Amino acid sequence: MSQIADKDVAEKPDADDSHKNKGLYAAILGSIGVVYGDIGTSPLYAFREALKPIAYDGVTREEVIGLTSLMIWSLTIIVTFKYITLLLRADNDGEGGTLSLLALLMKTAGTHRSVLIVLGLIGAALFLGDAMITPALSVLSAVEGLKLVTPAMDDFIIPISVCILIGLFAIQSHGTGTVAKFFGPITAVWFLVMGGAGLIHIADDFGILFAFNPWHAVEFLANEGFYGVVVLGAVFLTITGAEALYADLGHFGRRPIQWAWFCLVFPALTLNYLGQGALVLKDPAAMSNPFYLMFPQWAILPAVILATAATIIASQAVITGAFSLVRQAIHLGYLPRMEILFTSETNTGQIYLPAVNTILLFGVVALVLTFKSSDALATAYGISVTGAMVVTSLMFFEFVRKRWQWSIWLALAVLTPLLLLELIFLGANLLKIHDGGYVPVLLAIAFTVIMTTWQRGSRILFAKTRRGDVPLKAFVASVEKESAHAPVRVPGTAIFLTGDPEAAPAALLHNLKHNHVLHDKNVILTIRTEDQPRVRPEDRYTLTKLSDRFAVVELHFGFMETQNVTQALGYLRRTGYKFDIMSTSFYLGRRKLVPDPKSGMPGWQNRLFIALAETAADPSDYFRLPANRVVELGSHVVV
């Protein structure tokens, strides 16, 4: 739309502006439902949890105002300044997120490449851990409001929560396109209700407005000492979900996300925290559940229903984000191939990964059954999010130096205060390690080990198989020679998939050795994943002819694209390289991996790599190859 010619704008200014505005409004509403679902449910538990460390001897007026000030200024500094103002501009062709930023930095990584990869994988692992904790905590905190409707519901909180979560994961395979259009409006109503409730209760004590003065936050931390640091771990709950702003950049774009934040989300959150603070100033007994106690008795049940809907939407956003992140990791070579199903005929972003969905479901239900309440689960929350934020800040420092050409002094001046603040938050959350905080740490370690093992093992496997490779050009020259031992020529086209276009594929060598035939046309096909989200159609392939019978083709995909080989080969046919897809055979090499104590990895890591390789999705399904045209030839490889 930005490239419309001036004369076109002059001819139809009203229609054009109307079309652009409608698109912007739709994107703003969509971002409210997807991007801000997580941070929008934080008021359910954040203020309550932050009060607990200082409530052992009652809370003073100064403590409540100082605590509220901490929350408002955390939202202002971390979310508004770091994410909304700075990070949303650090896009990789419109895409955001940890792995997208990592892919962008790889282009200019230099000697820091390995450090950046480790940082990126840790950040991705922390997000996946967060994807387990967020649905459990959000749904539990919403359903617990039923206890205020009637105490008789107390015994049903966990069963209801588990049923909601099982239902949420069960519908993933059917897609969320039909209900997703309601996510934005429902979440917008949620923010309006939250903001309205907070605005009404500010009148309980207008003194809460002093919280806008950051000095009260500083004074609170200075006076509370150790307990102030503990409180910071709970205050951080107000900004959980901030990483989603960056991760979902590609879905909605920078402007809609920024408009939604400044026009609705930030004001609603600020008003709600002010309202909870004013309510506690008026009635300290409201500390038990200040969010729901802002509503009159008749409105608590409707508020619980709306909150439950909002938490389901927030959980859906995290699940979708996990699917998207894992797909990126697969395409970038950090995870083995997994089955990826598309739940929409029009939106390629709506995907479903059965393996990831199952892992998340069992993890989320286990967390609910283990911790049993949002109070207990909130202690486990925060470490994964703060860790992910610290990782993002470190990577962003490298980004502004290399991509934006900031001087070292400007980068330090802007980002050091942010990093120090996030490190303080991380330290405060680490105090909860013994009280459930070990859960996100263990999850992050597990996911990081899996990704680093797969990347390292794949590199070792590639190096070992290459040692015995036959150079492709030498192979072609030898088989093209006329001799009594020349292989039999058969009609049709054979396409051999390989990771190294400079070597003769193992499947080609095995076919020649055992069947003694060569096709009229032989295509050596390599699939490349680029460090950008999408590749233009004209850049989809490169074709190099080695002889009349042999050609090397490289197909290029972005890390956000579906690697549909059959469809991509259609571009090749249009250029004049003709072949009949129905008389074409796709040859794949299937390796049986055998552990080698001298592989370069510890024995346990070697066994883990082999186990991961055995779970990898069938390449014919993953690359969308016609099942009845695929031939697999096996071999043993020692790794």
From Swiss-Prot:
This is Probable potassium transport system protein Kup 1. It is found in: Cell inner membrane. InterPro entries: K+_transporter, K_trans_C, K_trans_N, Kup. It is a multi-pass membrane protein. It catalyses: K(+)(in) + H(+)(in) = K(+)(out) + H(+)(out). It comes from Agrobacterium fabrum (strain C58 / ATCC 33970) (Agrobacterium tumefaciens (strain C58)). One of its GO terms (molecular function) is symporter activity. Pfam families: K_trans (PF02705), K_trans_C (PF22776).
